[in-house]
Amino acid sequence: MERITGVALRYDEELPAPFVAAKGRGELATKLIALAREHGVPVVSREELAESLFYLEVGELVPESFYRVVAELLAFVWRTQGHGAGDIKSRK
């Protein structure tokens, strides 16, 4: 049985990049995902990205080499929540 890896990302417009807010493997990842869903936080399955970002520390900024894929992921989540591109700066 394959172990689940979960990595929670957060974007703060005052920081230069998104950062790792939480992470876990196995049972901890399952709990992290359940907690996110319970609180209405979008959950997206991107196994390769989660595996790559898992090696960052909680609080660590996403490296520049991942900017594009993470930006695409965050834009997808933002759009699926019914927001337009112009809404990003106005939310707080």
Task: Explain the meaning of each model-derived region.
Residues 1-92:
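Divalent-cation
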